[in-house]
Amino acid sequence: MRKRAAKKRPLLPDPRFNDQLVTRFVNNLMWDGKKSTAFKVFYDAMDIVEAKKQDQEKSSVDIWKDALTNVMPHVEVRSRRVGGATFQIPMQIRPDRKISMAMKWMILYSRRRNEKSMAQKLASEVLAAAKEEGAAVKKRMDTHKMAEANKAFSHFRF
């Protein structure tokens, strides 16, 4: 095991929106180290969001950030063994893990959509999540329901 927690490496902001969160999302989106392809997919998706959006005041990145906020879970259940039985214990999630989970869910459920390109799938999932719809938001709701159902075990904190 490590002696201390690994230091966080600084992320460079992306070239188009100058935002570190976008770079973090693209790093999750990337396959086989193909970062330029991942950036192209993300930027194409943002162009599609820009074309399809209803709210004219907000930029496509603001809509994406709203979608990410709507997908972020606040509590999760973790397994803990107590006297031979395994309990699902609800716990608060730290802020950086909330963001990571939201990004991963959004990408996962985008990939599962039935559309032509990944950019179209991602754009559709972003627009759906911004309206509090879509599979990624459903995943957050299910996670919260699971935590609510197991509230009785919350005294078994880690």
From Swiss-Prot:
Keywords for this protein: Ribonucleoprotein, Ribosomal protein, RNA-binding, rRNA-binding, tRNA-binding
GO CC, one annotated term: small ribosomal subunit
Gene3D superfamilies named in the record: Ribosomal protein S7 domain (1.10.455.10)
UniProt cross-references to Pfam families, sorted A to Z: Ribosomal_S7
Keyword RNA-binding: yes
An example Gene Ontology molecular-function term: tRNA binding
Keyword tRNA-binding on entry: yes
Record function comment: One of the primary rRNA binding proteins, it binds directly to 16S rRNA where it nucleates assembly of the head domain of the 30S subunit. Is located at the subunit interface close to the decoding center, probably blocks exit of the E-site tRNA.
Stated name of the protein: Small ribosomal subunit protein uS7
Species whose genome carries this gene: Flavobacterium psychrophilum (strain ATCC 49511 / DSM 21280 / CIP 103535 / JIP02/86)
Lineage: Bacteria, Pseudomonadati, Bacteroidota, Flavobacteriia, Flavobacteriales
